[in-house]
């Protein structure tokens, strides 16, 4: 029995030696020549790059805690994720187009909270890239006998995201007979640092060029500024057909629209033209698709209809 055990051990050792000396018969898996490894799409590479840029931007933001100035991305597109905003910037996509595409910033009324950062009578805000849409609102004072006629005393403009672009008190050219302070919020004291009408008018004219103007009953604001704007580039919340039901078919007030559609109380006391412009822009943004349809119907290009018009039929030759 001991001899058998000894022989078995010798056999095992011999088998191990033989297996070690022989080359492996296993074939390595071949990579098929017809199916080379696919390259990652450039979009993925760009997106990865964007994420890295976003992370580095976030890291630098943490290091700069307490800084006074916010980034351009934060100013122009609140609610946009950093990586998405960076991607838009790299690909020359405007912040407002990005917000419109992803419905960012218009899901709630957070735009109205920006009032805490408003700079009264600041003039033109620097460092903001102004997009396609702007909203305007003006405050008037009374001139003439009894103060029944109106003259411009303040004008405010915000962008698509409710960010203040312009705000200025304006010196009326006529003598003010009624400051209407309880409504306008303007007093004689406000005029100490007011700008001349011509200066304000020139600034507003530049801002309006090539842009879509949003406002409430814009006819009065444009008349006060002695400016005009193409009808196709105007979006007026007072004339929008979808809002007329809130005033029994007539022009609804901005205060009623803000209350009914936004759940926001404005004009409770002294008016703020910045707040009113912001509320108007928010109303437009929340109902933009309906505004677009209404505008398309109103300014649809006229196309010649076939067949039945005079002069289209060939003349018959006389025999």
UniProtKB/Swiss-Prot annotation:
Keywords, in A-Z order: Exonuclease, Hydrolase, Nuclease, Nucleus, rRNA processing
Subcellular locations according to the entry: Nucleus
Residue ranges, annotated region (Disordered): 1-75, 295-319
Molecular function, one GO term: 3'-5' exonuclease activity
A cellular component term, taken from the record's GO annotations: nucleus
Family: Belongs to the REXO4 family.
Alphabetical list of PANTHER family matching this protein: RNA EXONUCLEASE 4 (PTHR12801:SF45), RNA EXONUCLEASE REXO1 / RECO3 FAMILY MEMBER-RELATED (PTHR12801)
Protein's name in the database: RNA exonuclease 4
Organism listed in the record: Gibberella zeae (strain ATCC MYA-4620 / CBS 123657 / FGSC 9075 / NRRL 31084 / PH-1)
